[in-house]
């Protein structure tokens, strides 16, 4: 299994959590972003910088991801593409996406985007905080314990 990190919006609070697991499990990891992102120093991490542009990092992740790989991303359409390749995806708040739930999350995301575009609602999700990092750590570590 390879771990992929969609680095474009990766929260700083998650970096030490993920780095500890990468080191503990000697987990091959690719951090992909359109700018330099530093998760930490590890011989198990490869940093890949893609061209600027919408979804360039997403396209590279999809190209490289294989069955049973894990992608950390807050991008639900990217998670959907990974699931369709028989990969796994987890978001920054610890939600593990699956074939059973990804379409529901995608539909909700699209609905909320439409509501925001209509002006009926502004803003996005609440700010990321320590409770979110804790939920992520629990789900991430449980996934790794089961799959590594």
UniProtKB/Swiss-Prot annotation:
Belongs to the UPF0178 family. Disulfide bonds: none annotated. It comes from Sulfurovum sp. (strain NBC37-1). InterPro entries: UPF0178 (IPR003791). This is UPF0178 protein SUN_1096. NCBIfam families: PRK00124.1. Transmembrane segments: none annotated.
